[in-house]
A protein has these predicted regions:
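Protein kinase glycine-rich loop
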Residues: 17-23, 28
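Conserved N-lobe loop of protein kinases adjacent to the ATP-binding glycine-rich P-loop
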Residues: 32-39
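AlphaC helix of the eukaryotic protein kinase fold
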Residues: 46-67
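Short beta-strand micro-motifs within the conserved protein kinase catalytic domain, predominantly
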Residues: 75-87
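Conserved short submotifs of the Hanks-type protein kinase catalytic core
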Residues: 84-98, 102
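Activation segment signature within eukaryotic-like protein kinase domains
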Residues: 116-117
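Protein kinase catalytic-loop region centered on the HRD/HxD motif
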Residues: 122-132
């Protein structure tokens, strides 16, 4: 198990810069990639690669790869396993603040609200067309690139809809969860994301 407050993992081809944050099953760090030289966000799973949650992490990588070419979805650059056996994702780095932090300072103006909403709605539509239900759309998961373009991030609890759907649904963010998830409904569908959006 990786101690997210301990030293960062050693990842070949990358230099550690700082810890960005930690969640339930992963920690996100800022690294500098050696080739090509750029700053990237590296999401490292806290559990070892043999742990059963490793498949959840692999699923997130594969789901993001299916849709990350959309301009309003966080780009994934690669994935691997660190020297100490922890799976990781290499992603586009979006400097703070994310939408949740911005909204705590006050509301966006009408033009910013419409622009952000339209772009994120396009990202959600793209995910749905690929058969992916995000399941965790909330202000904290809407980041802004260096050029102030909003991007949807964190596909960690996403699920497939339609024939590829899994019976196992994990987690939710209660304030943005649709009513059917709050009453224990086990299926994921696009309407859930629309409600959260």
């Amino acid at each position: 198990m990786l101690d997210h407050k301990g030293p960062p993992p050693v990842i070949s081809g990358f230099t550690y810069l700082e810890r960005l944050g930690a969640g339930g099953y992963s920690t996100v760090y800022l690294f500098e990639q050696h080739m090509p030289r750029r700053e990237v966000a590296v999401k490292v799973m806290n559990a070892d690669v043999e742990d059963k949650t490793a498949s959840r992490f692999e699923s997130e990588a594969n789901l993001m790869a299916r849709v990350s070419s959309h301009p309003a979805i966080l780009s994934i650059y690669g994935a691997g396993v660190s020297a100490d056996g922890h799976p990781f994702l290499v992603m586009e780095y979006c400097p703070p603040p994310q939408l949740g932090a911005i909204l705590r300072q006050g509301p966006l103006n009408v033009a910013e609200t419409l622009s952000t909403a339209i772009q994120i709605a396009g990202a959600v539509e793209t995910a749905h067309r690929a058969g992916i239900v995000h399941r965790d759309i909330k202000p904290a998961n809407i980041l802004f690139t260096t050029y102030r373009r909003p991007v949807l991030s964190d596909f960690g609890i996403s699920a497939m809809s339609g024939p590829e759907a899994s019976e196992e649904l994990r987690g939710m963010s209660v304030p943005w969860a649709p009513p059917e998830q709050l009453v224990g409904m086990r299926s994921a569908n696009p309407a859930s994301d629309i409600y959260s959006l």
